[in-house]
């Protein structure tokens, strides 16, 4: 899971 995109993953 990406660090900056972890919120956009879900």
UniProtKB/Swiss-Prot annotation:
Task: Tell me the organism.
Answer: Acrosternum hilare
Gene Ontology CC terms:
extracellular region
GO terms for biological process, alphabetical: neuropeptide signaling pathway
Question: Which cellular compartments is it found in?
Answer: Secreted
Protein name according to UniProt? Tachykinin-related peptide 5
- Superkingdom of origin organism: Eukaryota
Answer yes or no on keyword Glycoprotein: no
Organs and tissues of expression: Expressed in the antennal lobe (at protein level).
Chain positions found as Arginine amide: 10
Keywords tagged on the record: Amidation, Neuropeptide, Secreted
